[in-house]
Amino acid sequence: MSDILQRVGDKWTVLVVGKLGDGPLRFNELRNAVGGISQKMLTTTLRGLERDGFVTRTVFPTIPPRVDYELTELGCELLKPVAALGEWARKNTARVNAARARFDAAVAETSVR
């Protein structure tokens, strides 16, 4: 169970699954939509999601080749908890940042002594 939680709790997995929730995307479309992800990390994330059954990869016989990524039924089931996590993060970002600032200030104060 921990390996599955590790996969679905990964930052990039959450972002990729969220973007694919709007429909199939090509690699570069997905990379642009996610933002801040390297080509290598996106490749690794997509391969892991495909291996675990969350994403399908479809290669179209065109020139140049076209590859689409799409959520499977299992991936679509993951959308609801991913969306809830994203909503929670948006709602609580200020509170988390305030807690971090208080903690950092307390640590800085004790290290000065």
Cite the ranges covered by each PLM segment.
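Beta-hairpin "wing" of winged helix-turn-helix
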Residues: 50-70
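N-terminal helix-turn-helix DNA-binding core of bacterial DNA-binding proteins
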Residues: 1-41, 47, 68, 76
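Hydrophobic residues in alpha-helical membrane-spanning segments
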Residues: 25, 62-66, 82
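Generic structural "secondary-structure junction" signal
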Residues: 7, 62-65, 105
